[in-house]
Amino acid sequence: MNKDVSLGQPIVRYEDGKLFNTTDQYVTEFPLTIMVNGEEFATVICSPTNLEELVIGFLASEGAILKRDELKSVLIDDSKGFAHVELNKDLGDRFQYSTKRMIASCCGKSREFYFQNDAAIAKTSMSKITLTPMQIINMMTRLQSASHIYQETGGLHNAAISDGLTFFVHRQDIGRHNALDKLYGFCIQRHITVRDKVLIFSGRISSEILIKAAKIGVGVILSKSAPTTLAVTLANDLNITAVGFIRNGGFNIYSHPERIIDSEQ
């Protein structure tokens, strides 16, 4: 059973020249240790929702699995903070001698295989999807309106996958990588093809987020914030359309603008 993603806690607030007691919503940090074939693989600090999706998406992002059929079983014991995964294969030497890792909620830079492993897994997009400006603006508006817990706490990252019209899945997490891993896990579980889908994301498009989008396989990533220079370089190299600063009825296209058409047809 999923735990609460946020909890009300007593605080002291200062406002209008006065101190007073009240309550506020805190986001929950939940450590989940992932065991693969009986061996400790990593501990992820996350929000305690959609944990099976998170585990599957995380393992796929790390290159431990490539498809749903490689999973024999996934058992979540959230009372003890463990995910027990059995694969229909061995992990192989690349993972056998790796050190135990703590993946913090704030970022992904503690990942042992950052860039070396990522380069082998990230996919060059062959997406044929096209979007109109109004589709882009409407998708970001919908993401923000769906993020009620962020509005209460200000502490969660939000992400969704869409075909430009319909949201297939929307997920939230304290960690930006976790939110995307949950989307990835959802799609793997249901054999959803994401080549011609769009990733909508509440945070900045960093190089790590761009690589994550490439691993998932989408052709377009939308964000209300700006990308980094390395993210734009990677987006151009991986044939991904990166759109940022989606706000107040406008946006910037940073790479592969051919997928954005100035027409409502």
Curated annotation (Swiss-Prot):
Active site as annotated:
107 (cysteine persulfide intermediate)
Q: Is ATP-binding among this UniProt entry's keywords?
A: no
What is its subcellular localisation? Cytoplasm
Chief subcellular location? cytoplasm
An example Gene Ontology molecular-function term: sulfurtransferase activity
> Mind telling me which Pfam families this protein's record contains?
FdhD-NarQ
Is Zinc set as a keyword in this record?
A: no
This molecule's function is given as: Required for formate dehydrogenase (FDH) activity. Acts as a sulfur carrier protein that transfers sulfur from IscS to the molybdenum cofactor prior to its insertion into FDH.
Q: Which HAMAP family match?
A: FdhD
**Full protein name:** Sulfur carrier protein FdhD
State the species of origin.
Staphylococcus aureus (strain NCTC 8325 / PS 47)
Gene symbol here is fdhD
